[in-house]
Amino acid sequence: SRGLGDVYKRQGTCDGMNEKGLVASLLFLPESVFDRPGDTRPVMGVSIWTQYVLDNFATVHEAVEELKKESFRIDAPHMPNGSASTLHLAITDETGNTAVLEYLDGNLSIHEGKEFQVMTNSPRYDYQLAINDYWKEVGGLQMLPGTNRSSDRFVRASFYIHAIPQTPDAKIAVPSVLSVMRNVSVPFGITTPDKPHISSTRWRSVSDQKNKIYYFESVMTPNLFWLDLKKIDFSPKAGIKKLPLTNGKIYAGDAVKDLKDSDSFVSVSYTHLRAHETL
């Protein structure tokens, strides 16, 4: 694809938007089970699952039609630091169509439709929807669950995303969505080693799919910045660019001018991780 992606520690793509306005976002889900007994299908590493979607599809429906064939299996061994790479994927396109993809007991579960506007972490999506239905009956103006648990954050996000102004004006829509994301973020410094799905929020991103602008906010820096895809040269001769976010780098506003030449990242591979596990 020609587009943008958040590359976590040079190990894989966790979030991004391609030039067609398709957005893919990967989040932790402890209930994920990718393996099937005796599965002999070709293997795709979980670290490139998001990038595969961004590289190959322009719309959610295109992606769903191909992915539901389950022509490959996802390999998701433990990371070098010992944490499980149990994840689920949300994709959305510029029409507003969305799909949430989860591997449960080795089988791909897909929820597709414009009504699916929120994804957090645990529990699995069908259970999460049932919890949210209960809170809809309670009514968000009366009471909302307020803990850092992902199921509570889902309920709050689901209520507030419908309460904010529904407008095509990006100057209102982007900060409105960010206000919801900040409300459901886990404060920095909170750690629960045995429950990574309720650990601190490290960043927030908003994708303006109609105007092709990708907004990013790190909890370690004071400013919101963005990249306008319309201003970036995506021709092969332009090569790969990156925006370094480590070592105290701070950006504000349009950061296209700050892009640097880069090599392609090396995704975490099955063999690389197995080598770590046997040390």
Model segments located where?
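Catalytic cofactor-binding cores of redox enzymes
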Residues: 69-108
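Compact, glycine/acidic-enriched structural inserts
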Residues: 37-72
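Short, surface-exposed beta-strand-loop junctions and turns on beta-sheet-rich folds
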Residues: 30-32, 106-108, 220-224
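A contiguous strand-loop segment
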Residues: 5-41, 74, 252-253, 258
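C-terminus-biased signal that marks the final domain/tail of proteins
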Residues: 75-77, 84-85, 94, 117-274
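Aromatic-residue-lined binding/catalytic grooves and analogous aromatic/hydrophobic interfacial grooves
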Residues: 97-101, 105-127
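A short, structured loop/turn motif at beta-sheet edges
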Residues: 20, 55-61, 170, 210
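Conserved small/polar residues in nucleotide/adenosyl-binding loops
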Residues: 2-11, 271-278
